[in-house]
């Protein structure tokens, strides 16, 4: 993955989690963790975080993972990287107001964090170049 898509992916994931930490009424587990590390002052901005910033950061992470596919051509990595932001975006824009939206948001945020850690620990490598695709060597 290119440097810009890696930075955008990490920014999207981190921004989504910090935005969710600012909403004590919506996500009490994340809000208690946010208050423990000193983010309690963000509670006055929770409307802005949930309605504007959280979908924006989720869309940024989705776009970064979609553009990353053009670099490494690993569809499973890109798909897993795009599912989390899509869940977060759907929970904050289309499904807001349902009783299970917070649980869906937790799943999306956890998936975003998990894929970001996976990408940090094991970065994607290029599989296809302009001259064609290289297949891995066969084992006998």
Curated annotation (Swiss-Prot):
GO molecular function: mercury ion transmembrane transporter activity; metal ion binding
Membrane topology: Multi-pass membrane protein
Disulfide bond positions: none
Pfam families for the chain: MerC
Cell compartment(s), UniProt: Cell inner membrane
InterPro entries, sorted: Mercury-R_MerC (IPR004891)
Any single Gene Ontology cellular-component annotation: plasma membrane
Disruption phenotype: Mutation does not affect resistance to mercury.
Inhibition and activation profile: Uptake of Hg(2+) is decreased by iodoacetamide and iodoacetate, and is completely inhibited by the thiol-modifying reagent N-ethylmaleimide (NEM).
Keyword Translocase set for record: no
Residues that span the membrane, as ranges: 11-31, 47-67, 79-99, 107-127
Sequence ranges on the Cytoplasmic membrane side: 2-10, 68-78, 128-140
Primary residence: membrane
This protein's record includes keyword Cell membrane: yes
Annotated Hg(2+) binding sites: 22, 25
Membrane topology, Periplasmic segments: 32-46, 100-106
Keywords of the record: Cell inner membrane, Cell membrane, Membrane, Mercuric resistance, Mercury, Metal-binding, Plasmid, Transmembrane, Transmembrane helix, Transport
Function noted in UniProt: Involved in mercuric ion uptake and binding. MerC-mediated Hg(2+) uptake does not require MerP.
Name of the featured protein: Mercuric transport protein MerC
């Amino acid at each position: 993955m290119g440097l810009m898509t890696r930075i955008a992916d990490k920014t999207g994931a981190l921004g989504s989690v910090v935005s969710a930490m600012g909403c004590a009424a919506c996500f009490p587990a994340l809000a208690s963790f946010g208050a423990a590390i000193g983010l309690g002052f963000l509670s006055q901005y929770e409307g802005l975080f949930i309605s504007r910033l959280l979908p924006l950061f989720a869309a940024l992470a989705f776009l970064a993972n979609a553009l990353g596919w053009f670099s490494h051509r690993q569809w499973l990595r890109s798909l897993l990287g795009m599912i989390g932001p899509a869940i977060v975006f759907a929970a904050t824009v289309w499904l807001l107001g349902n009783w299970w939206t917070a649980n869906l948001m937790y799943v999306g945020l956890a998936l975003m964090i998990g894929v970001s850690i996976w990408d940090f620990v094991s970065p994607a490598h290029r599989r296809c170049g302009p001259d064609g695709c290289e297949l891995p060597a066969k084992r006998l």
